[in-house]
Regions:
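Glycine/Thr-rich phosphate-binding loops of Rossmann-like dinucleotide-binding domains
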Residues: 88, 136, 195, 264, ...
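Auxiliary Fe-S-binding modules of radical SAM enzymes
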Residues: 1-77, 81, 112-119, 146-157, ...
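Short cysteine clusters
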Residues: 64, 85, 89-92
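Alpha-helical elements of the RecA-like P-loop NTPase motor core of helicases
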Residues: 90, 197, 237
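Core AdoMet radical
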Residues: 93-113, 118-172, 177-213, 225, ...
């Protein structure tokens, strides 16, 4: 297995991230980032059904601001391989793993349950993501691939999008997921290279680029996608450089959204990026060859994923 910052299953532990909040004045939330919560009944019903099947969504675990909107229209991003992550990224509120917990084991029925839930919801576009499982020799890639196959069997006419971890740079694991037949392969860069040690301390910028490059070379007909957050202290030129790096891997789709601090334990927001800047990022991305760029304050990598993939696919028809 390629070098990984978490060496063995016995060596990982809960990663506690602490920040000196006294030295950081959090900016006030601007009007364009105020979103009301509605459709409580629909949201509650979907949560009950997910719990009944023992399933998780990144929408809930990552405290996505779009959860009410997406759940109300019957859309959700399934998060597999459990609900505990072996990494401690500064931006993420997904629960972190500690060794020896029984709930850290894999549920062999999870792939089938995801397929059943997606079928019951009548999803035309199914998004599957996962926590990092650096404790597993294959990074969870066999389980990931099996989930894709089960969804494919249950919904043969639907699009399947995967949002994968870096698998510690193990390209065999990446190939395993791609061989299961997703339509869209997504791996998020998350932030600019300078901020990696602070935002993604157990990931590597070049390694994530290699994952994207390999995916497109291995399965050229699969749409490749990557997302990043802004508002963590990056500069415009750094965002442009990241977009160029990602596009050089022949990535088709880019998503750009505002980072919002999910809990007090996470990184503080450095600044709130105005909508006009998101528009400029979109225009820049399109100018360097992306098929589609979805850029806006509330954009997340799987937000309106069906519409974004349709936009990217239409490029071939023009």
């Amino acid at each position: 297995m390629p070098e990984c910052s978490l060496a063995t299953a016995d060596s990982f532990s809960l990663v506690q991230i602490n920040f000196n909040r006294d030295s950081i004045a959090a900016p006030r939330l601007p009007e364009w980032l105020r979103k009301g919560k509605t459709h409580f009944e629909a949201v509650h019903s979907l949560k009950i059904e997910l719990r009944r099947k023992g399933l998780h969504t990144v929408c809930e675990s990552a405290r996505c601001p779009n959860i009410h909107e997406c759940f109300s229209r019957g859309s959700a991003t399934f998060m597999i391989l459990g609900n505990l992550c072996t990494r401690g990224c500064g931006f993420c509120s997904v629960p972190k793993a500690s060794p020896g917990k029984s709930q850290f084991s894999l549920d062999p029925d999870e792939p089938q349950h995801v397929a059943e839930m997606a079928s019951e919801m009548g999803l035309r576009h199914v998004v599957i993501t996962s926590v990092n499982r650096d404790d597993l020799a294959d990074g969870g890639s066999h389980h990931f691939a099996e989930t894709v196959r089960k969804v494919r069997a249950a919904l043969p006419q639907s699009k399947v999008e995967v949002l994968t971890p870096d698998f510690c740079g193990d390209l065999t694991a990446v190939a395993r997921v791609l061989d299961a037949g997703p339509d869209i392969f997504n791996h998020n860069m998350e932030t600019v290279e300078r901020l990696y040690r602070r935002v993604r301390p157990q990931a590597k910028y070049p390694q994530s680029l290699r994952v994207l490059e390999f995916a497109k070379k291995y399965k050229p007909r699969v749409l490749a996608k990557s997302g990043l957050m802004v508002g963590l202290g990056e500069t415009v030129e750094e965002v442009h450089r990241l977009l160029r790096d990602v596009r050089c891997c022949n990535t088709d789709i880019a998503t750009i959204g505002q980072y919002l601090q999910p809990t007090r334990r996470n990184l503080p927001v450095a600044d709130f990026v105005p909508p006009a800047t998101f528009d400029a990022y979109r225009d820049y991305g399109l100018s360097i060859g992306f098929r589609a760029v979805f850029s806006g304050p509330f954009v997340r990598s799987s937000y309106f994923a069906d519409k974004v993939s349709e936009q990217a696919s239409r490029v071939d028809d023009q």
